[in-house]
Amino acid sequence: MAPGRGVLLLICLCLMDNVSQVVCSQNSTTPSKFPTFYSYDCNADTYAPQLTSFSTIWTLLNVLVMTIACVIYLIYMCFNKFVATMTNT
């Protein structure tokens, strides 16, 4: 048996020893805070997103980071093109 195979087997045995089963005490899920969100009457025109929710803040932060990254990249590319054009003439 290869030396690495024994270590892998030992790790697998340790992980399999700690496997347990989780038993739920309730059979139902908690009710939604917004029960009309999944109804057919709710669409983009009638559903108002909350600007203070975590997902909205996270999305706006991602948009800001991507915008800054694109601006930095475009400035870098334009500067390199400008320098290359100036040195060729």
Swiss-Prot record:
Pfam families reported for this sequence: Herpes_UL73
Membrane topology: Single-pass type I membrane protein
Residue spans, topological domain Virion surface: 25-56
Cellular location(s): Virion membrane; Host membrane; Host Golgi apparatus, Host trans-Golgi network
GO cellular component: host cell Golgi apparatus; host cell membrane; membrane; viral envelope; virion membrane
Main location: virion
Domain of life, source organism: Viruses
InterPro entries (alphabetical): Herpes_glycoprotein_N_domain, HSV_GN
Family to which the UniProt record says this protein belongs: Belongs to the herpesviridae glycoprotein N family.
HAMAP family, per database record: HSV_GN
Known role: Envelope glycoprotein necessary for proper maturation of gM and modulation of its membrane fusion activity. Also plays a critical role in virion morphogenesis.
Protein name per its UniProtKB record: Envelope glycoprotein N
Source organism (scientific name): Equine herpesvirus 2 (strain 86/87) (EHV-2)
Gene that specifies this protein: gN
